[in-house]
């Protein structure tokens, strides 16, 4: 696109728009469990611990991580940690999800699953902005901007 606008809805009664981001390097509090990481934004928004744990378990299950809910972050593989943080990013039902290299530390099968999950978020009204070098992720995107050459997918500068 050569021009246009981006608007981020600000739901009434909330201070901040629902924007979540997931960084390439899966940093977390090493001693805290996977479920603690996913529940954190829910607790910060005032959800009870019991409710937050139910929702966090649902999200962990969606990423095939329910069996790791109580495992400390330090004991997760790089791919598991990345998926925990993706689940955390989705915990507060963001309208905009910013993701940096979401498949960089994953095996091919898991990377395909993550790409599919990210692609399906648009059906839920979530806009996803992805920074990636992965051609399979790029192929699933509605629009691609090649920052290396400052061109969009049609070659326009």
Language-model features: locations:
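Catalytic Walker B motif of ABC-type/P-loop ATPase nucleotide-binding domains
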Residues: 97-100
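ABC ATPase C-loop
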Residues: 89-90
